[in-house]
A protein has these predicted regions:
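Conserved N-terminal alpha-helix of the aminotransferase class I/II PLP-enzyme fold
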Residues: 32-76
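Conserved C-terminal alpha-helix-loop-beta "cap" of PLP-dependent enzymes
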Residues: 287-425, 429-436
Length: 444
């Protein structure tokens, strides 16, 4: 597969041109020489009609959708998805309403606030962590049938941060029945398209989807895709670039664009076979760990999520143990340890991880359970709360206050309490359990 962005950028780096344009480093350095701006021939991300357009068309063929690049991660794509849904709502003649699984990324909340979108929160029949929210089609259908008016979209995070895949295909059928778009935050699952069979949300019926290429593919941090299904309303494809432009910088990184372009060639050159081989090896490791006594969570092929309390360790303590072995995990909390692997981890990397985990001394199981997940009562809209006068207070002193901004870091960037909800005693208990020290609350 051709790599037009790589070819142009690399050719310019070799040209010995006197750079009297941005950036200020003038190409002095191994990395800097590839960091260019929109010079003649370099195209323009949001008005693409040259090398960027050609590269995006290559990505579209690979993903079986109309694919657009982001250099600002899925955060930009999520905001664009909600903007497109707001346009869809306008075409239907009412205020936008989105039914969303509760474990949304905080960029969803910022988009809801900026775009003044109403949200109907969806909860699973059983929930053990605020990071996971696996819905079935029946739960979604019940919510849509009882909504004040037909929601314009249903929003899922799949895979979620712990590695749980949603029932996208059956939920897509419900969405079609009610005329709602299906939006999927697939930030952790760009590789799912290349499994046999594909588990990618677009192939399972999603209308709009975003992937963080940088999370699971060999692309630089910030590289992401916005996918619009060929079966989705045409207006979504027509307005996608405008949607991304609304939330994007006018100085997109050509280092990131170049890496997305290079990823196309990588994906086109036997990646499916390489992925299948690695997934099989990782599955073998998962089976060994389960036989050794580890409790595993989730069904995402490239994520290894452990619940190590059964072995006598919190997730935080196990992460520290691995760090001592020079193995750095993606995320840990009192209950979970999340490890993200790709074919680039390699066989030696898997063996190193296996040796570390199987040599961990076993202890008596920790029986302390996490606080029961609950939903606080919403008293303001997300927009009202996020734009209201606010102050930062100690989390333990926030009882009865209304949360303003979702002050949660990344990872995991999934809020325990939603902006506009009144903080209750159960939320205070969660703050303590997850070591949340402060929160930003509305000044009433």
């Amino acid at each position: 597969m051709k790599t037009p962005i790589c070819d142009f950028v690399d050719g310019y780096a070799r040209s010995d041109a006197l750079r009297l344009h941005m950036p200020g480093h003038k190409g002095a350095g191994e990395i800097e020489q590839l960091d260019i701006t929109e010079i003649d021939g370099a195209d323009s991300l949001y008005e693409a009609n040259g090398i960027i357009r050609e590269s995006e068309e290559n990505a579209s063929r690979l993903f079986g959708a109309q694919t657009f690049y982001s250099t600002e991660g899925c955060s930009q794509c999520i905001r664009a998805m909600l903007y497109l849904t707001a346009l869809y709502a306008k075409s239907r003649g009412h205020r936008p309403l989105i039914a969303a699984a509760r474990n949304v990324h905080k960029s969803f909340l910022s988009a809801v606030a900026l775009l003044n979108i109403d949200v109907l929160w969806l909860y699973p029949k059983e929930q053990t962590s605020y990071l996971s929210c696996k819905l079935d089609a029946d739960t979604v259908e019940q919510a849509l049938s009882q909504a004040p008016h037909a929601p314009d979209g249903v929003y899922l995070t799949s895979p979620d941060y712990l590695g749980t895949l949603a029932s996208v295909e059956s939920i897509a059928q419900v969405c079609r029945k009610y005329g709602a778009l299906l939006l999927v935050d697939n930030a952790h699952g760009a590789y799912l398209r290349f499994l046999q069979p594909s588990l990618h949300p677009v192939d399972l019926g999603a209308d709009i989807c975003c992937d963080s290429a940088h999370k699971t593919l060999p692309a630089l941090t910030g590289g992401a895709y916005l996918h619009i299904s060929e079966d989705a309303p045409a207006m979504l494809r027509e307005q996608a670039k405008n949607a991304l432009m609304l939330f994007g910088s006018t100085s997109p990184s050509y280092l990131i664009l170049r890496s997305l372009d290079a990823a196309n060639a990588y994906l086109d050159d036997g990646y499916s076979e390489k992925l299948a081989e690695f997934v099989a090896r990782l599955q073998g490791l998962k089976e060994k760990l389960a036989a050794h006594g580890y409790c595993l969570w989730g069904d995402e092929p490239l994520k290894l999520t452990l619940m190590p309390k059964t072995c006598g360790y919190t997730g935080k303590r196990l992460a520290q143990y691995l760090l001592e072995q020079k193995i750095v995990c993606e995320f840990s909390d009192p209950d979970y340890l999340v490890l993200m692997l790709t074919p680039e981890t390699g066989e030696q990397g898997l063996k190193r991880l296996e040796q570390a985990l199987l040599s961990l001394p076993k202890r008596s199981a920790i029986t302390q359970a996490p606080p029961a997940f609950h939903s606080c009562h919403g008293v303001m809209s997300v927009r009202e709360a996020m734009l209201a006068p606010c102050e930062t207070v100690a989390a333990q002193a926030s009882l009865g206050r209304i949360l303003a901004a979702p002050g949660v870091g990344c990872p995991p960037a999934v809020p325990i309490v939603i902006s506009g909800e009144r903080i209750d005693e159960a939320a205070i208990e969660c703050f303590s359990y997850y070591s949340v020290d402060t929160c930003t609350v509305v000044i009433e």
